[in-house]
Amino acid sequence: MKKTLVASSLAIGLGVVAGNAGHDAHASETTNVDKAELAQKALTNDQSLNESPVQEGAYNINFDYNGNSYHFESDGSTWSWSYESTNNATQPVQPSQSQVATQQQPVQVSAPQNEQTAQPQTKSTSTSQTSSSKASSGSSVNVNSHLQQIAQRESGGDIHAINPSSGAAGKYQFLQSTWDSVAPSQYKGVSPAKAPESVQDRAAVKLYNTGGPGHWVTA
């Protein structure tokens, strides 16, 4: 994707540790961290982890819990979190990160991308912006902010993206059968990744308006 951080279905981020003037919290000082609660939030991709750090101040926390290795850090203004499996899995899993910047401007939030297979997870980036409906870059189609977030989580906004494991393609990672049900006649049977961005946007808006966001696992 086109932002700085990586996200996958097995990657999360947490931030825990208070900080105050003249004193930075270190991992050794975070004995009050509720590992079970943080791990559960990570595994369920609790949105609160992307919206704010769990405590104020700088921190750097690492721990292993129930077969996963967790990492959380913050410099006091930005925070990141990630985890990766420490078990011997049948398929390799690549860790990824998610980072949120605290600014006066619209907050940029990254979130893990969900995969519904046991295939190797591919690295991707994800950034969502809180904004009103607007036209996508290179497209005159008005796409609502939720659908923009879905596109970022699915492909990072790459209209030519193709998932090698599932075959999903395009900006919104359409499966071919789903694409054929909403695409214009001249693009039916054609890979979504080969269609112009405006065509992909219209198809996604049509699918969203008729069936809701449930067609995307990252919604």
Swiss-Prot record:
Region (Disordered): 86-143
Cellular component GO terms held in the UniProt record: extracellular region
Highest taxon of the lineage: Bacteria
GO MF annotation: an example: hydrolase activity, acting on glycosyl bonds
Position of the signal peptide: 1-27
Keyword line: Glycosidase, Hydrolase, Secreted, Signal
EC top class, as a word: hydrolase
Listed Low complexity bias regions: 89-140
InterPro entries: Lysozyme-like_dom_sf, RPF
Pfam families: Transglycosylas (PF06737)
Free-text function comment from the UniProt entry: Is able to cleave peptidoglycan and affects clumping and separation of bacterial cells.
Family membership noted in the UniProt record: Belongs to the transglycosylase family. SceD subfamily.
Protein's name according to its UniProt entry: Probable transglycosylase SceD
Native source species: Staphylococcus epidermidis (strain ATCC 35984 / DSM 28319 / BCRC 17069 / CCUG 31568 / BM 3577 / RP62A)
Gene: sceD
